[in-house]
Swiss-Prot record:
Subcellular location: Cytoplasm
Similarity comment text for this entry: Belongs to the bacterial CoaD family.
Enzyme class, spelled out: transferase
Name this protein carries in UniProt: Phosphopantetheine adenylyltransferase
Function per UniProt: Reversibly transfers an adenylyl group from ATP to 4'-phosphopantetheine, yielding dephospho-CoA (dPCoA) and pyrophosphate.
UniProt organism field: Moorella thermoacetica (strain ATCC 39073 / JCM 9320)
EC number: 2.7.7.3
Binding-site residues, substrate: T9, K41, L73, R87
CDD domains: PPAT (cd02163)
Domain of life: Bacteria
Gene that produces this protein: coaD
Amino acid sequence: MKVAVYPGTFDPITNGHLDIIRRAVSIFDRVVVGVAADNYKKTLFSLEERVELVRTVTRDIPGVTVKSFSGLLVDFARREEAVAIVRGLRAVSDFEYEFQMSIMNKKLASDLETVFLMTATEYSFLSSSIIRQAASLGGCIHGLVPPEVERVLLKRYGFL
């Protein structure tokens, strides 16, 4: 069984993330979405809330499991018996950072591959931070995040 991990902060998960997850599941037998504790970022949603949101919006995608993790990504990938790390690329600007990370991960775990998937064109501008900013100002985020996420965001910012 070929397992991949798809790590991220997912604060919140967007339709761009879901696009990558669906496509990764078509390549691998199982995809573990790793929600990072990420002690280096101030998140809008707690780790538990982010895990629950990701679980909610991926519940109907066969082959997907959702787990939280902290520490090195390669250690998480090894615990999950993954053969690959999946990363989404929105633009060339993402590639430089992701390329450096993939080299470091390869140094730490030479048997682990990194697979880059280009985000669908309609989501190439999308990021969690853009979604948070738009939602906080009352902007329309419909169609950019799953309905469950839209509801939670609007409620968090006092628009529901």
